[in-house]
């Protein structure tokens, strides 16, 4: 019995520690600052010299008549940001280089009490630097010019996806030395028209187009000069070292905020900012992706499949962290045209869409070392939600199904506890008989177990077998963006944050107290005191846990109480009639 209790206490302590480290909430995101194009976006580009410097492998750019004549009736020719809006994205493009410097997620409000303020993903203001950069570098690439990055022209200063329109194309043009460039952004409608407003509000995966948060980026190079053009396509994500504004924990430990890449040896390789502080990462990769992760959301560049790219991470002179890639050398003969493209994903961690975009990208939903158990659990939870339409009730239904699946193991555990409870008077007598002689008391206990055919670990091992599944479910509820701002009923308007009135944690503590009353009292006084404190300790921890986690624990405890009460009464009744 001592061994059983000790193992259970250690297991519960480990689970509690892991849960505290994984607990997150989504308050405190800063407002999107006013648009500003004055920030320096050249710093950190691959093989890019400074504006005042020169580079031995990049010729000095000089304007030409051919370049000026190729301009196609520009309207916006300034450093003013180009605004683009779809039904799911609200973003700004800096004409200086054509970088996406601001991006808000319209379907994911910053807070429930501010539904009109979208969650800010990209930002290049005074408080935070986080942007998606792409361009052409190399021998003739305009982004490698000593004069600085190219200033693109656009036909409009703002673009918006119209009703009934499924695709929005934004072209930026630039001409230099007889070469005409078009940087084309392609945006897509995010929500399906055949879904109701209620289904869209529930963010059902069936109502979200798979390319909703994908931005197609392509370069059209029209070489009208008298020589062959040569350059390389690059893309990168640049972020400063500030904390994730959407994720903090009760202990001050943030969830993973950093880079990740796909490599042939690892479909999901995390590269933290600490790793970038120590050394650069470089590897030649065919296809794959590079990404920057934060709680619930991810941004990723996905190059053309089949092409060889140089993936790298580094830290620039301004303290920004960069993850990106450079593509193979492009060669455009005089009088020819070439197009090269890639895809940017910027949005929530929707596993189905991420997996379809590029293999391994769905692993950015980081379920920890038990991901192989967590992913099937999430798959089942998502299918239940497609039928029920409420994540709170879906959690309850999933808890019931898991409890049914482990019913035989749980029943074995409770039967063992019931037998221990039945012989507890004999155990107490042994304790009183041998007093402080622990060796004799242990020998007498083992003889009692053997005589009564009781396995002291019989009630513990079944619980330990189930623990990986329970822990995986916790991580599913913690890391899945579907839980963010998802209501259940009544006062629970967001399953991803704490219960505002602490009702569920108090109920959870009550269920733990009832469970304790059904279990036999430990013979060791110290263990008995520790077990009595467990409901209080857990209630305190769970006061700040996401309501979805506490809901799972409450339902699981209630089912366990019912099962244990039934089995215990059945065994006691059989003992009386024997």
UniProtKB/Swiss-Prot annotation:
A Pfam family recorded for this sequence: YidC_periplas
Listed GO biological process terms: protein insertion into membrane; protein transport
Chain positions covered by the region annotation Disordered: 34-72
Chief location of this protein within or outside the cell: membrane
Skewed-composition ranges (Polar residues): 37-66
Topology in membrane: Multi-pass membrane protein
Keywords associated with the record: Cell inner membrane, Cell membrane, Chaperone, Membrane, Protein transport, Transmembrane, Transmembrane helix, Transport
Location in or out of the cell: Cell inner membrane
InterPro entries noted in UniProt: Membr_insert_YidC (IPR019998), Membr_insert_YidC_N (IPR028053), YidC/ALB3/OXA1/COX18 (IPR001708), YidC/Oxa/ALB_C (IPR028055), YidC_ALB_C (IPR047196), YidC_periplasmic_sf (IPR038221)
One MF term in the entry's GO annotations: membrane insertase activity
Record field: transmembrane: 3-23, 361-381, 387-407, 457-477, 500-520, 535-555
GO cellular component terms given for this protein: plasma membrane
HAMAP family the record matches: YidC_type1
Function (record text): Required for the insertion and/or proper folding and/or complex formation of integral membrane proteins into the membrane. Involved in integration of membrane proteins that insert both dependently and independently of the Sec translocase complex, as well as at least some lipoproteins. Aids folding of multispanning membrane proteins.
Family: Belongs to the OXA1/ALB3/YidC family. Type 1 subfamily.
Subunit structure: Interacts with the Sec translocase complex via SecD. Specifically interacts with transmembrane segments of nascent integral membrane proteins during membrane integration.
Name of the featured protein: Membrane protein insertase YidC
Organism classification: Bacteria, Pseudomonadati, Pseudomonadota, Gammaproteobacteria, Pseudomonadales
Gene encoding the protein: yidC
